[in-house]
Swiss-Prot record:
Subcellular location: Cytoplasm
Enzyme type, top EC level: transferase
Binding positions (S-adenosyl-L-methionine): R101, D102, E117, R118, D174
Source organism, top-level taxon: Bacteria
Listed name of the protein: Ribosomal RNA small subunit methyltransferase J
Organism: Chromohalobacter salexigens (strain ATCC BAA-138 / DSM 3043 / CIP 106854 / NCIMB 13768 / 1H11)
KW Transferase (keyword) present: yes
Cellular component terms (Gene Ontology): cytoplasm
The family this protein is said to belong to: Belongs to the methyltransferase superfamily. RsmJ family.
Function: Specifically methylates the guanosine in position 1516 of 16S rRNA.
Catalytic activity, as annotated: guanosine(1516) in 16S rRNA + S-adenosyl-L-methionine = N(2)-methylguanosine(1516) in 16S rRNA + S-adenosyl-L-homocysteine + H(+)
Gene Ontology molecular function, alphabetical: rRNA (guanine-N2-)-methyltransferase activity
Keywords: Cytoplasm, Methyltransferase, rRNA processing, S-adenosyl-L-methionine, Transferase
Length: 256
């Protein structure tokens, strides 16, 4: 739904052309959601009462920095689900990258991660955030383990993986679901994703594609009480306080 957002200002003219986004000059933008360059980096914003604060991808500060320093290492739920353990650091594709939070955690723990995002505006935020992380001394090594690609994983996962020359042992999925978090901030952020991407009605197709591509396992993040994605039953489940991971295992990940 690239027409739902407009890239604003001369600095984004080339980016808009490359990603197929609408573009308008500064001062002319009338779209509900605007992509614009700010001193803090690329930002996606709309009417604050509806969408909340501007959305950026920043791996160098804030929650990402805190989680990098104090997040709990390989004991974190996403790390356990993806099979990171002593002597085991799999190659991972995050096929529903979003703002890259889970992928950054996995890269922080040493994994090589390909992030795939289908929404052009969100991909642009990821590209910008990763570029700034690459230029920061504290995060450059982590950023070097992350690559970002734009595409619809439900339809072209195999070709995207081949194009980026990665043989993923693990595919991580976090399909859109009705968000029950009581935080108004989270609710407003999710409005942006829903307005741009809609619900993931093709989650069963996405799971099927992931199972075809992953050599060892597929992990699917779900609300704790939500049913699994329609299709094959998961082999294992890991539960957290508000979410869980459904694990579809082809074979075990073993220490190198």
């Amino acid at each position: 739904m690239s027409d739902a957002v407009v890239a604003v200002g001369e600095p984004l003219r080339d980016l808009a052309a490359r990603l197929g986004l609408a573009w308008q000059a500064e001062g002319d933008a009338t779209a509900a959601l605007r992509l614009a360059m700010t001193p803090e980096g690329l930002a996606l914003s709309g009417e604050a009462r509806h969408y909340g604060a501007p959305i950026r991808v920043d791996f160098t500060a804030g929650k990402a920095a805190h989680r990098r320093r104090f997040g709990g290492g390989r004991g974190q739920l996403v790390a356990k689900a993806c099979g990171l353990a002593r002597g085991v650091t799999p190659s991972i594709v995050d096929a529903t990258a979003g703002l890259g939070r889970d992928a950054f955690v996995l890269a922080t723990l040493g994994a090589e991660v390909l992030l795939i995002e289908r929404v052009a505006a969100i991909y642009a935020l990821l590209e910008d955030g990763l570029g700034r992380a690459s230029a920061n001394a504290e995060t450059a090594e982590i950023a070097a383990r992350m690559r970002v690609a734009q595409g619809d994983a439900a339809r072209e996962l195999a070709s995207l993986v081949a194009r980026h020359d990665i043989a993923p042992q693990v595919v991580h999925l976090d399909p859109m679901f009705p968000h029950r978090d009581k935080s108004a901030l989270v609710k407003k952020e999710m409005r942006v994703f829903r307005d741009l991407a809609g619900d993931d009605d093709d989650a069963p197709r996405l799971l099927e594609a992931a199972l075809d591509v992953a050599s060892h396992r597929v992990v699917v993040k779900r609300p704790r009480r939500a049913p699994p994605i329609e299709g094959p039953a998961p082999h294992h489940m890991l539960e957290g306080k508000t979410s869980r991971y459904d694990l579809y295992v082809h074979r075990s990940l073993k220490p190198e």
